[in-house]
Design a protein with these regions (language model features):
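Non-transmembrane, aqueous-exposed alpha-helical and coiled segments at domain scale
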Residues: 1-127
Length: 127
């Protein structure tokens, strides 16, 4: 496997074939984004990563996130689980014993969380 990140991501994306390279880049970026939101660096769960993915997508794409993800081959939260576990298998991400691909199944519906009036959690006004 190549040594630089971009080439490694390309290899993983090509080996699987279901998702665009940009989906892999975005998941990697979302992991970094999510970890930076923590007070103390630690392992994050699949659900925590999905929350970070949602917030980053709202920041970057807003209501167009569903369309962007669709172009990349992502149609449900389980697709992010497939990408994460492809990266785990390539030793580009780590997992704990408790982590499972199923942690990503049906966590939220894209059409519900990526609406025009949706904002990342950090940008919402307090209730």
């Amino acid at each position: 496997m190549p040594s630089n990140l971009e080439d490694r991501l390309r290899c993983v994306a090509a080996a699987d074939g279901r998702y665009h390279i940009n989906a892999y880049r975005f998941v990697y970026e979302a992991l970094d984004y999510t970890v930076k939101q923590l007070e103390k660096k630690r392992h994050i769960s699949g659900r925590e990563l999905l929350e970070g993915i949602k917030n980053l997508a709202l920041e970057q794409f807003g209501a167009l996130a569903v369309m962007v993800f669709g172009v990349w081959g992502i149609h449900k939260t389980a697709d992010f689980g497939n990408i994460v576990f492809n990266l785990v298998e390539a030793q580009m991400m780590s997992r704990s014993e408790e982590d499972n691909r199923e942690d990503f199944d049906d966590v939220y519906e894209f059409r519900d969380v990526f609406r025009i009036d949706s904002k990342p959690r950090s940008m919402r006004s307090p209730r």
